[in-house]
Amino acid sequence: MVAPPWDLPPDTSGIIPVIVHPSTGFGTGHHATTRLCLRALQIQPIQGRHVTDVGTGSAVLAITAAKLNAASVMAIENDLDAASAGRSNIAVNGVGAVMTFLVGNVRTVVTRPASCVLASLSGALLTNSARSIARCPEPGGILIVSGLTMQEESRVVHALEPIVWVDERLYEGNWVALVVKTRYRENLPHSTSRPGDVTSPFLEPF
């Protein structure tokens, strides 16, 4: 359950309460793309694993991963205002002990591959950044992407291949989330770089 503190029920047993202060639109948890990611995240074996949230915004997904007992969560955001909102939400949820918050870009993730990587971005950004984002999980790891529409789905899937394979697709209205799993390194082609991969703000130095 994602809500501001004044909307939480007195008894939160049986739910995962994520407190979010409504701010300047960096994610309140009520958009279909966030809901899809939350659905996908809660059925993954997160406990004891390392999670990275790329483009964390208000940190709803990162906080949820922490409350699902992830061993550690790295939240990455390249917008200073969004980063401020995310840090505030992490503090109010009391999950700072397992969190690392970095203001930067997706290149930061490469230094520490994660068991599960979350990327709720736009369809265009996912397409342009696919090869870099898909290499963030460790071999055999999980990548959950959202923010794409049904019209963008085939382009995003094509851009992610052959580094990952789609394990599950979730839909809400016109929005899509993909649960994809990374191939082991020995199953990858020698080179998967393409012209135009490094075209998004997430791939440029902050």
Where do the protein language model's features map onto the residues?
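Structural motif
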Residues: 1, 17-18, 50, 72, ...
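Non-catalytic substrate-recognition/targeting regions of SAM-dependent transferases
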Residues: 1-27
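Short, solvent-exposed coil/turn segments
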Residues: 13, 60, 173-175
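S-adenosylmethionine
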Residues: 44, 78-206
